[in-house]
């Protein structure tokens, strides 16, 4: 109880301070009267917000409400492990993802949907507005299995139809679907990077790639890409041919998408992990990008410090940092 009280006090202080949520000190723009604005939260919440499930998600709900988002995209939206343990929850006893309808209502979202769900790490989208599930993407064995699934959703806000694509690509250094005896060789040949390229190609071809006018439609593709971008090479100093750049080079060169964080923070490097790696991204189509007035990686009272749980190896509150976007609806 004391821990929760202190958390609530910190959230209140954050609100009074203007939600200063990054080392840059930039804050979300206050909505004007002329045009409505929406906020979008994107976060890999690590095993269905494992760090707060023993607290009935009270800190998580309080934190989400403090940003008053209109749309949320959550990666790893399934409860996988028992509270404070690295012990799997028995099948059928997982609160999430089926409990998202109840949980989302606690922070003001009456609508939710799930992307393609083929393993323990699906994505979920929640919203103040009705959600149309266009496609649940899992790929196929003959072409490309999308390891953690993906989703294409449409939400109409203030008369504007918005396309949302959620994803979470393969995390390992070796390729998906190979035997344990082949993993070392696959790792040596950057198999994981090439597999993530197959996944992102499949996802884009089956979403924005099907649009007749993607430049002028509103598209947002976001999630945990498990890949680094050549736009951040001022930090990494890799060879430009490095296979770790394959995923984002494809997005930047073969689609109309624009890297939102890079666009709003030219010359800066904003890690989205506890280390020095930006692997969580939000991409917008040109028409939507022109209306993004704020974007940042959140570092606030709750997510500012990522703490390793020594007993399990998991992180608290997550091993990733959230992204926050604000978009003007005009």
Task: Please state what every model-predicted region is.
Residues 2-7, 15-106, 117-120, 319, ...:
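N-terminal, active-site-proximal structural segment of metallo-dependent hydrolase catalytic domains
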Residues 49-50, 79-83, 118-122, 172-175, ...:
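Active-site environment of divalent metal-dependent phosphoester hydrolases
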Residues 55, 59-63, 95-102, 121, ...:
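Extracytoplasmic/secreted proteins, especially bacterial periplasmic and envelope-associated proteins
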């Amino acid at each position: 109880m004391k821990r929760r009280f202190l958390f609530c006090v910190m959230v209140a202080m954050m609100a009074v301070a203007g939600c200063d949520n990054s080392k840059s000190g930039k804050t979300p723009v206050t909505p004007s009267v002329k045009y409505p604005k929406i906020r979008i939260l994107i976060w890999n919440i690590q095993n269905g917000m494992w760090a707060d499930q023993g607290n009935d998600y009270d800190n998580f709900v309080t934190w989400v409400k403090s940003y008053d988002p209109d749309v949320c995209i959550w990666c790893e939206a399934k409860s996988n492990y028992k509270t404070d343990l690295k012990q799997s929850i028995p099948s059928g006893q997982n609160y999430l993802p089926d409990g998202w309808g109840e949980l989302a209502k606690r922070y003001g979202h009456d609508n939710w949907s799930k992307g393609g769900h083929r393993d323990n790490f699906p994505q979920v989208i929640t919203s103040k507005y009705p959600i149309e599930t266009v496609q649940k993407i899992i790929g196929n064995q003959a072409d490309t299995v999308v390891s953690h699934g993906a989703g294409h959703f449409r939400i109409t806000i203030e008369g504007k139809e918005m396309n949302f694509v959620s994803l979470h690509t393969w995390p390992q250094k070796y390729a998906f679907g190979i035997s344990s005896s082949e993993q070392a060789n696959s790792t040596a040949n950057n198999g994981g990077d090439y597999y993530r390229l197959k996944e992102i190609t499949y996802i884009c071809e089956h979403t924005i790639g099907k649009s007749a006018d993607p430049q002028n439609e509103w598209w947002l593709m976001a999630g945990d890409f498990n890949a680094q971008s050549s736009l951040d090479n001022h930090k990494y100093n890799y060879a430009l041919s490095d296979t770790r750049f394959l995923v984002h080079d494809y997005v930047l060169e073969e689609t109309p998408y624009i890297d939102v964080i890079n666009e709003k923070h030219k010359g800066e490097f904003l890690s989205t992990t506890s280390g020095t790696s930006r692997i969580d991204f939000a991409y917008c189509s040109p028409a939507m990008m022109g209306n993004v007035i704020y974007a940042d990686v959140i570092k606030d009272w709750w997510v500012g410090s990522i703490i390793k749980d020594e007993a399990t190896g998991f992180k608290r509150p997550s091993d990733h940092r959230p992204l926050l976007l604000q978009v003007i609806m005009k």
